[in-house]
Amino acid sequence: MVACSSDDPETDTGNGNGNGGNAEAPYVWGTEGAIKTCDHLLFNDDKTENAKGTVIGNGDQEFIFKGTQTLSKGTYLMKGWIYVGTGSVLTIEPGTVIKGDKDTQAALIVEPGGKLIAEGTKDAPIVFTSEQPKGQRKPGDWGGLIICGNAKNNQGVLNQQIEGGPRTKHGGNDDADNSGVLRYVRV
């Protein structure tokens, strides 16, 4: 594995999901304004970068995911605002659990033109939930799953700002827009 930094142009030879598969996208950092961009957003609990980590984002800043990435079946903790950028695809394998960090109000935001492919099964659904223990979870524990497409919205307004979001807008005139698949997913 190589470092995910702008001064290290090498690429990771794995696909980032821990199974040693072929590289789907390079492992490099970039910036878009004040937001970090990276093909892999996985970290260790101590916020060190790790393409095989179990923490998505580091909670210190927003991230925008670019390229094509697959989250292998497992349990992940999402910290901060994680964006699936325009032209990017995030696939989540069946049986995966993604917990949202309460302190950072973690959210997964699929921007217009980005895709989330989350196809669970009856026996192995994909679950998005609060990191809080069972029985202590409450509305507002985390930011949720936000999918912003280019189709008409119920406000009749093009490019409507998402609630609480500093950058992402939704709505347009493309009613054939496709932001991915949610099947056997519990939020």
Description of each model-found segment:
Residues 5-187:
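Beta-strand/loop edge motif enriched in small/polar residues
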Residues 1-3:
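Sec-dependent bacterial lipoprotein signal peptides
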